[in-house]
UniProtKB/Swiss-Prot annotation:
The gene is rplU. One of its GO terms (molecular function) is structural constituent of ribosome. The keyword rRNA-binding applies. Keywords: Ribonucleoprotein, Ribosomal protein, RNA-binding, rRNA-binding. GO terms for biological process: translation. GO terms for cellular component: cytoplasm; ribonucleoprotein complex; ribosome. This is Large ribosomal subunit protein bL21. Belongs to the bacterial ribosomal protein bL21 family. The keyword Nucleus does not apply. Part of the 50S ribosomal subunit. Contacts protein L20. Pfam families: Ribosomal_L21p (PF00829).
Amino acid sequence: MYAIIKHGGKQYKVSEGDFLNLDHFEAEAKSNVEIDEVLAVNDGSLKVGAPFIKGAKVVLEVVGEGKDKKVVIYKKRRRKDSKLKRGFRRQYTRVKVTSIKA
């Protein structure tokens, strides 16, 4: 059984027991979060919403927070002695899918 959920403008395919790194949101560790923006559920037969399935939800358990590896942005203009170097680390919230209710 799997579901396709929408969170933070992105879509994720999830199954029970999966771990995900979602965009950072405020939640305490060991707390449960319910997502009701379920686009599709497959439990032997595929159910697709328009755009969401009414009454379906995915329950997530917050494991913790963290940061991704650094991405380096480097810009240079030739022969101008102009350069720019920046770094960026995306913050995420790590969650575990505990149940899918369709």
